[in-house]
């Protein structure tokens, strides 16, 4: 009760500072919007990139990076998008389809009409998704498009290169992409000090400091897609993709100080996998208001891993993993006059067979079947807009004699009050049951070092989460800003649990424990100092978490910020970005993911764009992470450094050529994907 009162006081004290007249917001389909760059809605905002932003960008990562979306770190160097607030994952879509790196690099930013940034996803998006970015294009692809995107680090061995092409004739379109990326670095090192409380009460200390390391990996991804579109009434799309990843002979040499002994220990890891994926999609406009969409994805993953570590005594195991899954989904939508109604059914079946050989001998066979149904309505009663949704899942799970049936539920309600043309207040409440990731439900047991083991727990049950979100936003033609309060209560979550054996070995697993609570208050602002020429943006706030285990209570407060400045100078673009990283406490682990800063300059010449970036400047030994374990019997402090990611200078060259007639591409409303191989590491 005290936490709820504190939460309310913080929210209302934060929200007491908005009142002034504003210009009228104008939003028109397929029309350049001059009066407002951002339009707020119940589940997020619609962003209309300016012509300057589109002209200065060479792919989707580039244009999203310039928008400085709150709580997201968008890196056009590594082609990655991550949430820095630990609320969940980020889902990227183009015209409704969940896409990957190849589609993000191939899309021409000049074809973007708007970007739908959903920071409050509805029930149809499923579990674990905190943010959805849907990039909506004008769907006017040319008769053919060919291009390439080449990125290479100049200060270390790291690269990411892709070529792509698209050809269309009549109602048909064929597209292909191939991407190869890799790295080889020797500057990844960590320092760790661990204190173990033994059965007799003595403190036993071990120091583990890296003195030499090698990290290398190469990945190949190829995708072939055929699309047939009959105007907008019927769409059929089939794609076949394949991924191959190989990380051979990575090793680390550690200097071990173990009591009175000092010696060298070596860890060696190998990882190889390949995965073909077949994706079939169908859309039919039944009537002007009704539509039905179906999607089916079949995935096969083959994984071979090997791990060796000789701290204390040699320990080696291999894993031969096979995973097959079939994911299907059907969605019906009806745009009624008072509201829009949508309902859908999603079924996923997954079979995993992981054979642990060597010192970690175990054979795990898992069958996981999940049936998810949802219904949602969205409507408007001026000056209010609302969304009501309900999802329910039935999960059937078997593994090596363990058998469980779960029902999980996901209700959600949102209400938005439009105070005036530029200011709105919104509130969202949702409940959600979450299932632990598959690897931790395995019954395999793997040694981490001479004192520690990791053990799966097939008896894990879903946790029960409740979220409250209150936001006030204010927009004008040059200023976009909001303040938000967020409170999350997790009941019976999967939390860390450590056990000490009679022979002084320490076992890490997860069990359902009491509760985790999170309070987050933050603000965001973006302002055009010079319209279409100079833009600044910043966001920041305070994060407070409470972890209540059966035998521990840990609380933690942290603050965060991110800011950027971008100048559009004709064919030149200059950009700077900085954030202070991500600090969190979950269970008994306090963590920090490193701060990030970058300076960029780009130049556009005809169909070519050249970009030069300098990431983490003046940091020759970049601090990439820090972890502290707070268990009563184990205290560990680990700091990781990366020379490769400090003072990282990268060059990007992109080229795109489009010619020919127009073709309406598929607006894929749903998409399914599976990448989890269920292996404990």
Tell where the protein language model's regions lie, with residue ranges.
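Face-selective signature of the C-terminal outer-membrane beta-barrel domain
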Residues: 219-247, 268-402, 406-411, 418, ...
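Outer-membrane beta-barrel signature, preferentially recognizing the C-terminal barrel domain
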Residues: 404, 423, 433-482, 489-491, ...
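C-terminal beta-signal and adjacent terminal beta-strands/loops
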Residues: 605-681
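Short, acidic, small-residue-rich periplasmic hinge/interaction motif at the N-terminus
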Residues: 20-53, 77-78
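Transmembrane beta-strands of outer-membrane beta-barrel pores
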Residues: 150-154, 169, 180-184, 242-246, ...
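N-terminal periplasmic accessory domains that precede
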Residues: 30, 60-63, 80-82, 102, ...
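Short strand-turn segments of transmembrane beta-barrel domains in outer membranes
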Residues: 51-53, 142-164, 639
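Periplasmic plug
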Residues: 73-120
